[in-house]
Regions:
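Alpha-helix capping/helix-boundary segments
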Residues: 9-10, 40, 108-109
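A secondary-structure boundary/capping signal
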Residues: 6-7, 36-37, 105-106, 124
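Metal-dependent nucleic-acid phosphoesterase active-site entry motif
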Residues: 1-18
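Acidic, PIN/NYN-like endoribonuclease modules and their adjacent C-terminal/linker elements
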Residues: 81, 88, 107-136
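Extended, non-globular alpha-helical segments
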Residues: 38-65, 124, 131-136
Length: 136
């Protein structure tokens, strides 16, 4: 299964005390492939620095970059499906990588449910947790 993770869900999944820790553990166990672009990696690093610190950001990025479950995607066309330009990189990555799901808690992404082409399937963390549970 191929996913794109919005920064907000990645941020909450890395803490050892987080209820969402299962997401990063599932990634590390190879239960899904994480599709990223250089823009997404840059945003991940920036937000981890803001919310945690530089060392934590470096460790997170290293973990993602060195994982055999990470797929790097080149974006050749920008669809601009979302009103927030910063969010479009995630939708474009999902389309270009043919992702099964874009995982986000950001309600701005719900507009994608109304767009039939290109189709981007979005799920919240709890919805995706159910998807993983049903695969066991």
């Amino acid at each position: 299964m191929n996913l794109v993770l919005d920064t907000n869900v990645l941020l909450v999944s890395f803490s050892m005390r987080s209820r969402s820790r299962w997401l990063i553990e599932s990634f590390l166990a190879g239960r899904f492939t994480l599709s990223v672009t250089s823009e997404i990696i840059h945003e991940y690093e920036e937000k981890f620095c803001e919310h945690w610190n530089q060392l934590a950001a470096e460790n997170v990025i290293r973990t993602i970059l060195e994982s055999p479950h990470t797929q790097f995607v080149n974006i050749y066309f920008k669809f601009n499906l979302l009103p927030d330009e910063d969010d479009n990189k995630f939708a474009d990555c999902a389309i270009s990588s043919n992702a099964d799901y874009l995982i986000t808690e950001d309600r701005d992404f719900t507009i994608l449910k109304t767009i039939s082409f290109p189709k981007v399937h979005i799920r919240t963390l709890s919805e995706f947790e159910q998807v993983l549970e049903n695969q066991r």
